[in-house]
Amino acid sequence: MIGLADCNNFYCSCERVFRPDLTGKPVVVLSNNDGCVIARSEEAKALGYKMGDPFYQVKEKLEAEGVAIFSSNYTLYGSLSNRVMSMLSHYSPRIDQYSIDESFFEADESMAKVFFREHTEDHPTLFNKMTIDELSEKPDSLLHRYGSKISADVLRAVGIPISVGIAETKTLAKIGSKFAKKYKGFQGCCLIDTDERRHKALSLFPVEDVWGIGRQIARKLDYMGIRTAAQFADKKESWVRSHFNITTLRTWKELNGESCISIEELPQKKSICTSRSFANEGITDKNVIEEAVANFAVRCTEKLRRQGSVCQGITVFAWTSRFNGHVPEYTIHDSLTLPIATNAQEEIVGAALSILRAKYPKPMADSRPDCPDMSFHFKKAGVILWQISPDHPRQQDLFDPIDRSKQKKLMEAIDAINRKYGYGTIRQAIQGTDCRFDLKRKYMSKQFTTNIHDILKVKTQ
């Protein structure tokens, strides 16, 4: 069996961990530069706020209704996500982190039985006096209580509410987690372990919300009169093959209980991107743009090394706003291919900067009546790494001038120091020190778990 642990309204839940006064109150989290709503608590959803609502349009309404507003605090969210994943690793030897707030894990009766036996020896009344033998006679009770305990323990230890789905496939487990999140009667865990439960769950689940069903496929299914996951799952395999691609066929098989995505099958990213929109009127200083691109390239290489990969292709882009008619428009978008695949940040940063400098516009000397400011105001920039392959084995070059072994040790040392003492402890000079391209985050909460200056102060009197 496969389980999925899904954090409920994750960003909002993170903001509530150190603000218990917000429990039961509406909360929203804003995107980069406080642009739009990207996360809502259940109370905020009940007030009618939608994902993607432009902040400037709903700001007055949010304030009038007493909604707590937060800028996105990704450092805090990442730290709490790591705590949740660490907790999950205590319950299952194999976990697959799917996103910052979701993780698949292996779940079976024998594992749950061993777990309960170990814990009931220390806490004999922990499970309402139901013995292990009695639980073993009711496998559904065993697995359900196993999932419910995971949900309860993560909430108690980390402060993040999670919903658990347990089923035979990853797709069914995701559906189970949705039911566990929506209906409190499941006690944090929805178990789909029989055909009867599977069909009942699918009959209540909209087909457009199924993992793996995109918008175009959903529209096509709707045109065919298929509105629920059960209607789709009940179709014959030959019909699915004749109308859809192999990816949709895999989803159909998963809905019918045939596992097509194993617990260890995490597809390696085909590309890695780090980008950012800049606040206010954008950036006009070439040095600041270079600093930003260097930082984005470093972030990409960190992700690359974390997944044990190297890359050969690099793309850099930057553009001005299309909506500001008072300044000139300009777009940078170019790529290059390295001779040897690498994950060393000095190589990738150097390549990214060479692209930017080669394409950066020359200053415009003469102004126009409709455009008095002739400087280029860049509103967004980013770096994309592609042609990604595993670090081992790596194609070598007999005439490579770089000592790859020495370079790898250097990267490992930098990563270790930055993990221990915080991001940016060791950095390249081109990255700067004062982050002159930082986001607009007026409603930013503190970094309670990673910044010693933001640690909560407890009054003892």
Language model features: what each stretch is:
Residues 23-25, 160, 312, 330-334, ...:
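A generic structural signal for short beta-strands and their flanking turns/coil linkers
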Residues 103, 310-324, 381-393:
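Core structural elements
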Residues 209, 217-375:
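DNA-contacting surface of Y-family translesion DNA polymerases
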Residues 1-256, 263, 404-461:
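Gly/Gly-Pro- and Ser/Thr-rich, intrinsically disordered tail segments characteristic of DNA damage-repair
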Residues 337-461:
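Acidic, metal-coordinating catalytic segment for phosphate/diphosphate chemistry
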Residues 120-125, 331-334, 397-403:
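Short intrinsically disordered coil segments
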